[in-house]
Amino acid sequence: YGGSQGNLIFGKGTKLSVKP
């Protein structure tokens, strides 16, 4: 999952820098 996408999908507000 991407950073900002992770925020929108999970709504955790955590930046997961998996995708560049």
Swiss-Prot record:
GO terms under biological process: adaptive immune response
Record GO cellular component, one term: plasma membrane
Keyword Protein transport: no
Broad class of where this protein is predominantly found: membrane
Keywords (A to Z) from UniProt: Adaptive immunity, Cell membrane, Immunity, Membrane, Receptor
Top-level taxon: Eukaryota
Region Disordered: start-end pairs: 1-20
Coiled-coil regions listed: none
Subcellular location: Cell membrane
Function: J region of the variable domain of T cell receptor (TR) alpha chain that participates in the antigen recognition. Alpha-beta T cell receptors are antigen specific receptors which are essential to the immune response and are present on the cell surface of T lymphocytes. Recognize peptide-major histocompatibility (MH) (pMH) complexes that are displayed by antigen presenting cells (APC), a prerequisite for efficient T cell adaptive immunity against pathogens.
Subunit annotation: Alpha-beta TR is a heterodimer composed of an alpha and beta chain; disulfide-linked. The alpha-beta TR is associated with the transmembrane signaling CD3 coreceptor proteins to form the TR-CD3 (TcR or TCR). The assembly of alpha-beta TR heterodimers with CD3 occurs in the endoplasmic reticulum where a single alpha-beta TR heterodimer associates with one CD3D-CD3E heterodimer, one CD3G-CD3E heterodimer and one CD247 homodimer forming a stable octameric structure. CD3D-CD3E and CD3G-CD3E heterodimers preferentially associate with TR alpha and TR beta chains, respectively.
Protein name: T cell receptor alpha joining 42
Organism of this sequence: Homo sapiens
